[in-house]
Amino acid sequence: MELPLAFNDQLFIQLTVNGVTLGSLYALIALGYTMVYGILKLLNFAHGDVYMVGAFIGYGVLSGLGGPLSPDLALAPLVLLMFLAAMLGSGLLGVVIERFAYRPLREAPRLAPLISALGVSFFLQNSVLLLFGAQFRTYNSFVLGSSNPEVFEPGPLIDPVFKIRGVNVQLIQLIVLLVTVGLCVALTLLVARTRVGKAMRATAYDREGAMMMGIDTDRVISFTFFIGSVLAGAAGVMFGLLFSQVFHFMGFLAGLKGFTAAVVGGIGSIPGAMLGGLLVGLTEAYASGYFGGRWAEVVVFGILIFVLLVRPQGLLGTPELKKV
Amino acid sequence: MTEPTEPRVGVDDWVAQHEERLEERKGLVGLLGRWLAYAPAPARLAAFALFAGTLPFWMDRGDLFAYGIFTLLYILLGLGLNVVVGYAGLLDLGYVAFFGIGAYSYGLLSSEHYGIHWPALASIPLVMLGTAAVGLILGITSRRLLGDYLAIVTLFFGQAFVVFVNAANPTVHGKGLTGGPNGVVDIDPLRFFGYELTTRTHQYFFLLGTVVVVLTALHFLSESRTGRAWRALREDPLAAEAMSIPVNRLKLMAFAIGAAIAGLAGCIFASVLTAVSPGNFGLPILITIYAIVILGGIGSLTGVVLGAIVINISFQFLAPENPQSNARVLFFAVLALVLVLAVRQRWLGAALVGAVIVFGFVTQAIVEAVAPSWSGGNVTEGGRLADVVQNWVVIPEGHDRFGNFAYVALVVAILVLTRLPGWWRTAALVPTVYLAAIVWENSFVEQPQVARWILFGSLLIGLMTVRPQGLLGTPRVEIV
């Protein structure tokens, strides 16, 4: 059945598909922001750069195993290994950042950890610049796993899996969506059903109270950073596989948009971050499709301002009560 | 300013006596610190102005540009940021955008771009009013936001500005408004009554005069009712509001004044460089200005001036145009200084420096005996100390990745070092410092620009964890 659509529906569907994949990435980044903010009331500027480091760890695994043109492994285990390495590496990085840059400042004035976070972000960016150089590094996901990469025969990652009204959905886009959904479900279960999840909720609700109840809040905070950074690492590899290119500055804008997603959804709220990510991804896709890519950032920024003015607690957030 | 005879309002006895309980530092550092703390503000200003006024007489044109003009520009930028962050305590991460708006506006009002050539007396006040208005608008949209939200909105605002001038470049009067990635070129020098400031010396003196005027104005502002209200707002917004301080109006005022100063700095920057491009207004300059304000001490005018001088000098030493020799000498001097300051006793510091030197020669000798190819590399070209370093630091030949591994090892070593107890830490300093020298010679010398950003980032983290109030800031006394 054909729906009567006044505008070019193929373009619209294509943009929707792109927006959902992009939104998945933002949702994963936003989760890290929202969890850390919920538990420490700290805005972790370095989170975008943890995502960038995740993308580079994936790149390191890929080039360590023979490079994208002649990998030593089959495609499936290779991609799985990239994901695992990036997630574990980013997770550890997040824990180290928390331990050395934020924990000593737990009792300091509010400005101190923010400035420290800015320093960490800048430090990570430039460390990667020093180690990998300024040029783009490519995952070559177009030919990754192809039987004949020398002649640029497309690999299976960009094979169309199915079509929606003539618009192809590539395998990699499906993988991104499925992995994101899987991680979100796992996270929700972790927070809702496990002991450590309960401790996280308690710490977010009232850190001092949780400490008095015998919860090792420092460990819970470390764990929160670990989980958030694991998600960011996964998002980094997904970015590399989707867009093929990674570079040292990619974390900055992605971090800003991830944060926008967290704010739009309601900071501190896990389902809010997922919803916000989807909204920001779709907005960006439509904006660049209909107005041109150069306006995408400006439009997303406008949305952030608008939401903050109209509903500062975000779509799914609860308004903060101030106790004097 | 006379010493108050009784505690300031809102300060109880324990807090008032806080300074007396502090141990006074001995030696030259302590003397300098005391002088800076007790010299009256006009004396400090006069000392600074007199010293800065002699600069053009003994510096050549290139140095005056790199050291004099840029330091003064950084001071001006730091002063503006100090109003927003230091006095009012608002974390404004879009500050550089105001600098950019000022520079671009001046560029459009006085250049060939649209063929408009306004004199500086007309364009500078207009640009300052314009940036203040933009600051006000940004402040109004985000006035309800708490600290962190404000930070991200302003950070995004700064990024949106760069994207706007770089990519959006809307067409106005048949011409791209901002010139895209190329920016605006052929900007006029500052012109007053038909007289143009074209030589570096003239520009320098104009800038110096501006800085002195702004410093004076800010000093009076910070001592005024408004200045006190800002500090109250910074320390506790809720309590300030309860004391019927008009919190919102003060926030907006801080935003507008900071933005106007940034706009002024932008005008002068554009006229001195005669061209502006989007690359001038990115994240690195933001970090630099923050490093200046934080190093000097948040809220301290003297601190901003000192911070700008220190940061700009280290900046110029690490600039790629400069001969390597200067950077190397500075780096090793700073390493030695850190080593001496890291321990309390001076003799121990001196012993540690000696230990590092011996450690280096021994390591180099061992490496040479065991694996000659690992020490066969040549030191990067350049002057003083090069011959010494050649025999002291391990520089492998033909191992391209060595510098990278050494860098990662250094970061890990420093992190581990901070966790070690007492004497172990002191002992571990020796190999760590030597490792830093290896990283410098194998990795940093080839990319001095990246190296300085890494050092600035680490500086922010380190200062926050060790001394969050900066060099000259007053530590917060918390009453529990």
Give residue ranges: language-model regions.
Chain A
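Membrane-interfacial amphipathic/re-entrant helices at transmembrane-helix boundaries
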Residues: M1-I29, I57, P68-M82, A108-A112, ...
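Cytosolic-side transmembrane-helix boundaries in multi-pass membrane proteins
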Residues: E2, Q10-L11, L131, Y205-M212, ...
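Inter-helical junctions in multi-pass inner-membrane proteins, predominant
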Residues: F7-L25, V169, L190-R195, I221-A261, ...
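Single transmembrane alpha-helix segments in multi-pass membrane proteins
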Residues: F12-S63, V96-A112, V264-I270
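Helix-loop-helix "hairpin" substructures at the membrane interface of multi-pass membrane proteins
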Residues: L22, R165-V246, I270-L275
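Short loop segments and helix-boundary regions at transmembrane helix junctions
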Residues: G38-A46, L92-T138, L190-G197, A202, ...
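Alpha-helical transmembrane segments within multi-pass membrane transporters and channels
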Residues: L69-V120, S127, L275-V280, E284, ...
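Transmembrane helix-bundle core of multi-pass membrane transporters
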Residues: P104-L105, P113-R193, V220, Y286, ...
